[in-house]
């Protein structure tokens, strides 16, 4: 679980509903989005939404994208990415999404509660770039390439690790 790249949901603009601490209660037909100054670079285009909510009744959320230029001025949107269901009887949903193709360098999420859905009572929302899955590591022994296992010593035992190169 990473920290969110956007302000807490309660600080976002809302068409309807009310702030509830760091979260918000959003009735059917409501939408919410961070203010334009929070527009972030699109990066890898893959993001994770972690939604903690109260499970009083099932509801749905449309996860959407708004596109921005480098001056954090909205270019267009919102455009639907996916719909997630917040099932009754649970309190957390995690959705991994890929932003659709666009030449815009920045984006903001937007969340809408469809008019046919129940109220969404979200206590916490985190949005962060989806971590890259660890790739296999290979080494060259001078004759052939072979798989390698990377570990580090924590003072008591070897612990699996991974290597990530950043350009």
Predicted ranges, named:
Residues 33-61, 94-97, 125:
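Extra-cytoplasmic beta-strand recognition segments
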Residues 20-42, 74-78:
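Secreted extracellular polysaccharide-interacting domains
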Residues 74-104:
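Extracellular carbohydrate recognition and processing domains
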Residues 2-16, 96-98, 112-154, 163:
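Extracellular polysaccharide-targeting segments
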Residues 72, 156-157:
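Residue-level signal for glycine
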Residues 58-68, 107-109:
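Beta-strand acidic-aromatic groove motif in beta-rich domains, primarily in extracellular
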Residues 49-51, 105-114:
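Extracellular beta-strand-rich recognition modules
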């Amino acid at each position: 679980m990473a920290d969110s790249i956007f302000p807490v949901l309660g600080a976002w603009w809302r068409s309807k509903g009310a702030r509830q601490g760091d979260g918000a209660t959003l009735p059917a037909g409501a939408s919410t989005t961070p203010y334009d100054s929070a527009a972030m670079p699109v990066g890898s285009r893959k993001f994770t939404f972690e939604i903690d909510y109260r499970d009083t009744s099932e509801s749905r959320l449309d996860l959407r994208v708004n596109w921005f230029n480098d001056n954090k001025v909205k270019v267009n949107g919102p455009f639907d990415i996916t719909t997630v269901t917040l099932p009754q009887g649970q309190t957390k949903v995690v959705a991994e999404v890929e932003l659709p193709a666009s030449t815009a360098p920045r984006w903001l999420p937007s969340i809408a509660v469809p008019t046919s859905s129940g109220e969404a009572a979200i206590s916490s929302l985190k949005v962060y770039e989806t971590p890259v899955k660890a790739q296999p590591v290979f080494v060259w022994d001078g004759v052939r390439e072979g798989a390698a296992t990377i570990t580090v010593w924590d003072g008591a035992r070897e612990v699996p690790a991974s290597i990530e190169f950043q350009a």
